[in-house]
Amino acid sequence: MITELHGIDIRENEPLKHYTYTKVGGPADFLAFPRNHYELSRIVVYANKENMPWLVLGNASNLIVRDGGIRGFVIMFDKLNAVHLNGYTLEAEAGANLIETTKIAKFHSLTGFEFACGIPGSIGGAVFMNAGAYGGEISHIFLSAKVLTSSGEIKTISARDMAFGYRHSAIQETGDIVISAKFALKPGNYDTISQEMNRLNHLRQLKQPLEFPSCGSVFKRPPGHFAGQLIMEANLKGHRIGGVEVSEKHAGFMINVADGTAKDYEDLIAYVIETVENHSGVRLEPEVRIIGENL
């Protein structure tokens, strides 16, 4: 127990595999669940004072945590999940579930968020990665975000300052942490929005191995190609290392089929990159983030 942080939900030596979509990941020295911005600021100020590293994990959907875990503080925003509407502007805290947020927009007949109706993860992670699918992406509706700087200061960043690109935002370089974001939606028809979301979710269920733990899409789309197609053409569907294999359903996904480890994921990613490059001359670039220490 850290007496200076009394009252905050903090768990020591907590295995992160219980919180990641891949079901892999070693322990965090301290796993914290702040309930508000004040508790979040207390954690960051304390960690900085004690020279302890800290990071925000988000919903850990497009992420692999190594088997040795993470030193210092890991902060999860599960309890920072409020969503508010002000006219056609939707504001969501970073821990709000992305899929549930799209349902709130639909309930109020607001259009613009349909593309994200099947993307797992949090609002904060979606902004960080400029998440997208089926022709839409976060940058298309983003207005602004409140972020926490490494010093514990809270400031607002505009869409222009985010420098959005394909699976990229400026905060990937600055280290700022999204704590809430505002999005510009438009009035729409409930039935039309609902039908579009049902269509996209049906496509996702047909094409993606949602029944297995995974980190989502592993690789960025190479210019002029599709990663899954290149992997399939290199005869890598079903290729397995340890407990992790390239999905037979969608070669762009790697699934945990038998108590796989982060090392299994990393080894398989490296093997796929090498094999695809040898076969097609295209070098795939991972979209998934890999963090933490090896065993």
From Swiss-Prot:
Its cofactor is FAD. Its main location: cytoplasm. It is an enzyme of class 1 (oxidoreductase). Keywords: Cell cycle, Cell division, Cell shape, Cell wall biogenesis/degradation, Cytoplasm, FAD, Flavoprotein, NADP, Oxidoreductase, Peptidoglycan synthesis. It holds the Pfam family MurB_C. This is UDP-N-acetylenolpyruvoylglucosamine reductase. The keyword NADP applies. One of its GO terms (cellular component) is cytosol. Residues 23-188 form the FAD-binding PCMH-type domain. The active site is at residues 167, 217, 287. SUPFAM superfamilies: FAD-binding/transporter-associated domain-like (SSF56176), Uridine diphospho-N-Acetylenolpyruvylglucosamine reductase, MurB, C-terminal domain (SSF56194). PROSITE patterns: FAD_PCMH. GO terms for molecular function: FAD binding; UDP-N-acetylmuramate dehydrogenase activity. Cell wall formation. It comes from Streptococcus pyogenes serotype M3 (strain ATCC BAA-595 / MGAS315). It catalyses: UDP-N-acetyl-alpha-D-muramate + NADP(+) = UDP-N-acetyl-3-O-(1-carboxyvinyl)-alpha-D-glucosamine + NADPH + H(+). InterPro entries: FAD-bd_PCMH (IPR016166), FAD-bd_PCMH-like_sf (IPR036318), FAD-bd_PCMH_sub1 (IPR016167), FAD-bd_PCMH_sub2 (IPR016169), MurB (IPR003170), MurB_C (IPR011601), MurB_C_sf (IPR036635), Oxid_FAD_bind_N (IPR006094). It comes from the Bacteria. Its EC number is 1.3.1.98. Belongs to the MurB family. It is found in: Cytoplasm. Pathway: Cell wall biogenesis; peptidoglycan biosynthesis. One of its GO terms (biological process) is peptidoglycan biosynthetic process. The gene is murB.
